[in-house]
Swiss-Prot record:
This is Adenosylcobinamide-GDP ribazoletransferase. Its main location: membrane. It is an enzyme of class 2 (transferase). The gene is cobS. Joins adenosylcobinamide-GDP and alpha-ribazole to generate adenosylcobalamin (Ado-cobalamin). Also synthesizes adenosylcobalamin 5'-phosphate from adenosylcobinamide-GDP and alpha-ribazole 5'-phosphate. Keywords: Cell inner membrane, Cell membrane, Cobalamin biosynthesis, Magnesium, Membrane, Transferase, Transmembrane, Transmembrane helix. Pathway: Cofactor biosynthesis; adenosylcobalamin biosynthesis; adenosylcobalamin from cob(II)yrinate a,c-diamide: step 7/7. One of its GO terms (biological process) is cobalamin biosynthetic process. It comes from Prochlorococcus marinus (strain MIT 9313). NCBIfam families: cobS (TIGR00317).
């Protein structure tokens, strides 16, 4: 019995967006994997949250746990999005005329290093501030970060259309609003579950409600602003959108929520 195409796309997203082992007995498909990126984000964020809880329970200092969790997130994604962040920062610094050339350069420039440093420091500060609320915040940030490229693909042309080895297939095979269905299912589930948690007085419903409201803004604004500045999007700017939205979401949650 052949697996449905959506399941093969999910298996493809699992391989493409993470370093996790492939699913046995299922041939992955890669044409429409972007729609499942938010689901993969929840898995990766869940693993980060799990590590946080295990180490905190083992009486590790919060500062050490924070560094390990951020390192785990970078490793689980294969550095894919961080590489895109650095390349995009270098491209923006070079100006629109030399943007793609700078982004294609295998050498990382000063702007790329600066962007990476700022993002990591902001994530560290945010997680330290969130404290016990960090595990839920990691899940929320990972989800919204992977939603950001969906808006970029819907709104902007691909800058390297036709070039081999690029992420242009994300736009080529997309089917309009259907690409947002998996993410919408997660939001619908969250909106259904949160009220029941509030009834039983679960304290962390504040994080869920704030995350649903806070994360949506950067998920749209970051890819929108990047697309306008670059004149379109590429695989690098998709990755940059993921990292920037994750970081901004964590920062906003840290600012708006009481210390955990």
């Amino acid at each position: 019995m052949r697996a449905p195409l959506w399941l093969r796309d999910l298996a493809g997203a699992w391989i493409f967006y993470s370093v996790l082992p492939a699913w046995p007995g299922l041939k992955p498909r890669f044409e429409r994997i972007a729609r499942f990126a938010p689901w993969i984000g929840l898995v990766l964020g869940g693993l980060q949250s799990f590590l946080w809880l295990v180490l905190i329970r083992a009486d590790w200092p919060t500062s050490a746990v924070t560094l390990l969790v951020i390192g785990l997130g970078a490793w689980l994604s294969g550095g894919l999005h961080l590489d895109g962040l650095m390349d995009t920062a270098d491209g923006l610094a070079a100006g629109r005329e030399r943007c793609l050339q700078a982004m294609d350069d295998s050498c990382v420039g000063a702007s790329g290093v600066q962007a990476l440093l700022v993002v990591v420091l902001l994530q560290i500060a945010s997680l330290l501030r969130l404290g016990s609320l960090a595990p839920l915040a990691l899940l929320i940030a990972a989800f919204w970060g992977r939603c950001a490229p969906l808006w970029a693909m819907a709104r902007f042309f691909y800058l390297r259309e036709g070039q081999a080895g690029t992420a242009s297939f994300h736009r080529r095979y997309r089917k309009g609003w259907q690409e947002a269905l998996p993410a919408c299912l997660v939001l619908l589930l969250a909106l259904t579950v949160v009220p029941s948690l509030m009834i039983v007085g679960w304290p962390s419903q504040m994080v869920l409600m704030a995350g649903i409201g806070v994360g949506v803004l950067p998920a749209f604004l970051v890819p929108e602003l990047l697309g306008r500045r670059l004149g379109g999007h590429s695989g690098d700017s998709y990755g940059a959108s993921v990292v920037l939205v994750e970081t901004i979401t964590l920062l906003l949650l840290a600012v708006l929520l009481p210390a955990g």
